[in-house]
Design a protein with these regions (language model features):
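Membrane-active amphipathic alpha-helices enriched in small hydrophobic residues
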Residues: 42, 111-115, 162
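Solvent-exposed flexible segments
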Residues: 97, 107, 112-120
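Extracellular/periplasm-exposed beta-strand and loop segments of Gram-negative cell-envelope proteins
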Residues: 17-33, 60-89, 116-144, 169-192, ...
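Outer membrane beta-barrel translocator domains of Type V secretion systems
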Residues: 1-101, 212-228
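Outer membrane beta-barrel transmembrane domains
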Residues: 39, 101, 130-235
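Short hydrophobic/aromatic-rich motifs at helix boundaries and adjacent loops
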Residues: 10-13, 120, 199-202
Length: 235
């Protein structure tokens, strides 16, 4: 278009990971998650370097949970576990500006607002709590992210990048009930910092397929490491 370049298309996503949660009551739990979904993404890059983008997505998440810190009827710690499966949907909008610092280095300053809704589920507890039913409420996550990324072209082979971001979670509380009583509710509400490093494999043709390999480290309310591999085709 006259203002720049409009890019849009479908997306497929799949991911997996593991987690550890700590409640104020002293209960520690560990688990694994995986998700898979579809969506749509759109981005407008203006000739001035300004860009804005958005996406919507829908999918399903499977998770398991295990803890040896649950309190049994006798007051001592017991082991319990469960499996869960529920749908999710989400969306994001963002705005930023890419500035060319020299022939091979660019700076990207951006702001994003991200929203995710994960549906509730009822699970049957295994282990010492065998047979008890836990009803999980839906979880809503609304996050604001401000960040910057530097990228450097690596000749004809691709682009290195590194970035920093600040993220604030406005919600993210996971509530549940058992026998009509509320359980301790973990929450990721609060501030987190993110450091990212990555490499995009792509030749000089801007419409050529690309592979984006990235790693992220988190500190603050969210702690840990994550990675991603994105396959991008433009036509």
């Amino acid at each position: 278009n006259n203002a720049g370049k409009l890019t849009y298309g479908p997306l497929l996503e799949y991911g997996w990971g593991n987690y550890t949660s700590h409640l104020d009551s002293g209960i520690r739990a560990d688990g694994n998650t995986k998700y898979y979904g579809i969506g749509m993404i759109v981005r407008q890059d203006n000739n001035s370097g300004l860009y804005y983008e958005g996406s919507v997505r829908y999918g399903r998440m499977d998770a398991d949970y295990a803890s040896g810190d649950m309190i049994g009827a006798g007051g001592s710690k017991v082991y319990a576990d469960y499996d869960s499966s529920s749908s999710y949907y989400g969306a994001h909008v963002g705005i930023g500006r890419v500035s060319k610092l020299n022939d091979t280095v660019k700076a990207d300053i951006y702001a994003k607002l991200l929203y995710t809704h994960q549906s509730g589920d009822s699970v049957i507890l295994g282990g010492a709590g065998n047979g008890e039913v836990y009803d999980f409420d839906a979880v809503n996550s609304t996050r604001a992210r401000l960040g910057a990324r530097l990228s450097k072209e690596n000749g004809e082979r691709g682009t290195y990048y590194a970035g920093l971001a600040y993220e604030y979670e406005f919600d993210g509380e996971a509530k549940a009930t058992v026998k009509g009583l509320s359980t301790p509710a973990p929450s990721i509400k609060g501030s987190s910092g993110m450091l990212e490093l990555g490499y995009i494999i792509q030749n000089k043709d801007v419409n050529a397929p690309a592979v984006d390999i990235g790693f992220q480290g988190w500190s603050g309310k969210k702690q840990g490491f994550s990675g991603n591999i994105n396959f991008i085709w433009k036509f």
